[in-house]
Every structure is written in C-alpha cells, then in structure tokens.
C-alpha cells in the first residue's frame, strides 16, 4: 500500500517547468526502487518485493528492437567516409557490439594492436555539464574483445590522425547527441532505415547469431549473461530451432 501511495504522489509531481514527468522516467524510477527491494531480499532477508507486487508505473511498452543487416550497415558506413571520427566510432560500435557509453570512454590504452584486442572497463556519461567516467554497467561488462584484422588496421590509421594523443585521452571526444546526429546524417545519405545508436549493438548480435555462434560466446563478447542473449534474441535463432526439431524427429524415430 505504501508503494502505491508513493506512486500516486510521484505522478502528481512536476518539473520546475510545470511539465509532468514522462512515462519512461516514471518507469525508470520505479525500476530503481524495485532493484533496491530485490537487493534487500537477496542480502537482508526481505520476504517480498513490494514494488513488484504494486506493479509498474509509466510506460510499459519496451522500445522495439531494430537492427541492420550487414548490407544495410555497409551502405550506411560508406556514407560516413567524409566524417572520419564518426566513421571510426560507428565501425567500433558495429563490429565490436559495445555500448555507446563504453565507446565514448575509450582511450589509446584500451587497445592492444599486437594481440588485436580491445579492453572495456569504463563508461562515459555527461552529468551536470561535466564529462564523467564511471565503472561499466555490470560486472560482466568488464571484458576484452578480440578485434578483426581490418578493424585493427583502421584504428591504427585513425590514431595517426590524432595529434598529441595521451594514453588516457578519449579517442572519441564526442557527445551522445553528436553520435545521434551522425546516425541521422548517415541514414539520410545512404537511404537505410533509421535506427537508434543502441540498435547497432543489436545488429552486431544479430550478425553473430547468423554466423552460427552460441549465446554463451556472444554473451562473453558483448558483456551479457548467455541467458539474457537467449531471452532477448530468441526470435533470431531460427536455425537452432530447426536443428532442435530435426534432432527430435531422429530421437522419436529411434
């Protein structure tokens, strides 16, 4: 009952401008409260999660997962050739499947071109007008990604264009808004459908699924638990489902 009263009260609050809070914001606040109760259940003996029992508030509609095929991405990136920094940023996003904040926190020290690896151990945020580097989203997000040869070559070329670069300097001193505008420019110039920056991550996962990699292997690369990959992208595993059905046919026949 207390949680429901809290929900009703917060719905009545407004911003300093007089506007009501958006459904997405309300849902995010409720989710954070629910996480606190889940923590109390796990570590402090709380019996139930009252936030979960009360139900969510705000938007219940999750944003549709969109992704590009490899052919669509190649059309898009070809249109970005005239904007080098954005070009290389999108190359990393698509071929490595990292998060936007992880991309914007990258430094030269994160690249090992001899081993052809990229280390992910931090994230970038803009808070109260300041650039802030934080720890990654989850413990699983700390990872080392193997880069394909062509991407190693591209990034070494890019580093040569960055004069006076220090080991701890951000190699993409961009804002999230600049990335979004770059995406809009590339989509318009190439004629491919508009997707969100985060959908490049979905596109990377989709590509790996189509290449035949397991949920465990993909999860390790993108910083997700394999169960999350299976849950989020189950509809993209049609060949696996067909293989299961074929093997069940064999088992039944035997």
Protein language model features and the residues they cover:
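Conserved tyrosine-mediated DNA breakage-rejoining catalytic core shared by Y-recombinases
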Residues: 56, 105-157
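N-terminal core-binding DNA-recognition domain of tyrosine site-specific recombinases/integrases
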Residues: 1-47, 62, 84, 173-177, ...
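Hydrophobic face of alpha-helices
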Residues: 30-34, 104, 148, 152, ...
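Active-site/catalytic core of tyrosine-dependent DNA strand-transfer enzymes
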Residues: 71-74, 123-126, 148-193
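C-terminal catalytic core of tyrosine-transesterase DNA break-rejoin enzymes
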Residues: 42, 91, 95, 101-102, ...
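Basic, Lys/Arg- and aromatic-enriched nucleic-acid-binding interface segment
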Residues: 19-23, 27, 42, 46-106, ...
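Catalytic-site neighborhood detector that most strongly recognizes the C-terminal catalytic loop/helix
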Residues: 67, 124, 152, 177, ...
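DNA/chromatin major-groove-contacting recognition/catalytic segments
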Residues: 75-79, 129-135, 235-254
